[in-house]
């Protein structure tokens, strides 16, 4: 298997064979992005069916607590500059959007499967959230570029996706990749490179799953 072009930094990504599931991933040593062989990507129909199995509702206390922690760490520190929000990839139950509305933010939602017509191409936002979204993206750089273009100057992109453990052996034993809809995996370094390529300024990256970036002002 030959190397593939990294979708984040364009360097060569070497093949990583998964003996258990008999599939190839590709690992970029420059930016640490890992992505699945495209022929293994599940169909939209299967992807939707898998999403519908999730218990992502306001009645799920653990799910709500996850978003409350996300809000506390990535949104509240910048709340004075945020009025209009887009919850990108909100899924069938837009819980984060509801929690933000309760705090007084104006919130739009978008999901390519469940709310595909709710985004206005002419709108721009002070904040775009993408929680548990980037691991599902076939081309995360282009999606991030699209989101950047919907941000106001100095607008914020807040991302939550679990960072992969790095070493090949650890990655192969990592539970997070067992979801067949998870096809892209990141580390903090990946988002630093992505931000540099798209003209974002990194405001915060933790060591687990969070990244906050700011679009350049005019």
Q: Could you say what each language-model-derived stretch is?
A:
Residues 1-127, 131, 144-145, 160, ...:
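Conserved N-terminal segment of class I S-adenosyl-L-methionine
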Residues 81-82, 152-154:
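A general structural motif
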Residues 103, 150, 198:
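Conserved dinucleotide-binding and phosphotransfer motif residues
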Residues 132, 136:
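A short His-aromatic
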Residues 137-138, 151-153:
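Helix-to-beta-strand junctions that scaffold the AdoMet/dcAdoMet cofactor pocket
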Residues 155-162:
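Conserved beta-strand signature within the Rossmann-like core of class I S-adenosyl-L-methionine
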Residues 162-167, 184:
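Short "lid" loop at the C-terminus of a central beta-strand within the Rossmann-like core
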């Amino acid at each position: 298997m030959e190397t593939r072009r990294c979708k984040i930094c364009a360097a060569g990504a070497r093949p990583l064979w998964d003996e258990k599931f008999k599939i190839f991933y590709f690992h970029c040593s420059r930016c640490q992005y890992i992505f699945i062989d495209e022929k293994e990507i599940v169909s939209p129909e299967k992807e939707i069916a898998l999403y519908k199995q999730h218990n992502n509702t306001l009645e799920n206390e653990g799910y709500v607590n996850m978003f409350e922690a996300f809000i506390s760490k990535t949104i509240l520190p910048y709340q004075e500059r945020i009025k209009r929000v887009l919850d990108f990839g909100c899924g069938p139950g837009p819980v984060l959007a509801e929690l933000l509305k309760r705090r007084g933010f104006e919130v739009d939602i978008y999901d390519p499967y469940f709310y595909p017509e709710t985004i206005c191409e002419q709108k721009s936002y002070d904040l775009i959230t993408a929680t548990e979204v980037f691991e599902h993206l076939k081309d995360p750089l282009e999606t991030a570029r699209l989101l950047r273009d919907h941000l106001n100057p100095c607008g914020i992109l807040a991302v939550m996706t679990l960072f992969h453990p790095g070493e090949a052996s650890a990655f192969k034993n990592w539970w997070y990749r067992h979801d067949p809809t998870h096809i892209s995996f990141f580390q903090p370094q990946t988002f630093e490179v992505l931000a540099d390529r798209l003209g974002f300024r990194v405001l915060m990256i933790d060591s687990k799953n969070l990244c906050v970036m700011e679009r350049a002002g005019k």
